[in-house]
Amino acid sequence: MRVALLSDIHSNLEALDAVLEALPQVDRVVVLGDIVGYGPDPNGVIARLRSIGARAVRGNHDQAMLEPSTLEWFNPHAAASARWTREVLTPQSLRYLAGLPSHGRVGRHRAVHGSPNKPYIWEYILDDLQALEILVKLGRRWCFFGHTHLPRIFTEEGEQIPAIGDWLSVPPSALINPGSVGQPRDGNPQASYAVADLDAEAVQFHRVAYDIESTQAKIREAGLPEIEAVRLAQGR
């Protein structure tokens, strides 16, 4: 089974549509949270994911739509964007986010936004030592995660920055982050996603160019913080 792994779309419809257009043949699309926040098209992104039957878990920005008190943990521009998002979400979109689980499974593997540690949504996986502690508890399976906006693979041998376009063999125990569709932070502004072949035990990472200027124009028209527009072109 081949699974498309998308994460951190962040209301960026142009980036999502570019990814979906470039997507190779897969059996399932899995979204690893943070569907909304930062960007200008939360309802459009949700509608698109619903239309393709994508499976998704909840991220911290999605959680903030349901639990506004969590905004105290956000930086000022992220909180401002989240408040704007909450105001423009339709009742149908809000129900969709409320129905998302905090964690899920893809075959025998795990799918979360932050980490496989409860409550699954908030923890960042950033270094080898932290990843190794998680891998010991995870056992012989993979965990797909997002949250950091950085395409990465963590194994018992350490952190790997994956090459683009190559099929990479992955050991039985691994943490796999496809990077961010809507707000990459690795210095490359192109949308990032991955495809996992569960039978071949391999993962392929992809980057896709999209119309950043259109997204930036929408951000400015909506009155969202300027940093959300500027950072898209920088990939930061």
Label every PLM stretch briefly.
Residues 6-7, 29-34, 55-60, 112, ...:
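Active-site neighborhood of phospho(di)ester-bond hydrolases with catalytic His/Asp-centered motifs
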Residues 1-4, 105-111, 169-174:
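Beta-strand-turn-beta hairpins that frame and shape the catalytic cleft
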Residues 1-54, 72, 218-220:
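N-terminal active-site segment of His-dependent metallophosphoesterases
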Residues 128-167, 171-176:
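Anionic-ligand binding region
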Residues 155-236:
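Acidic, His/Gly-rich catalytic cores of divalent-metal-dependent hydrolytic chemistry
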Residues 45, 51-112, 118-139:
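Active-site neighborhood of divalent metal-dependent phosphoester bond hydrolases
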Residues 18-22, 44-47, 70-73, 125-126, ...:
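Short, glycine/charged-enriched secondary-structure capping and boundary segments
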Residues 10-15, 37-40, 61-66, 119, ...:
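Active-site environment of divalent metal-dependent phosphoester hydrolases
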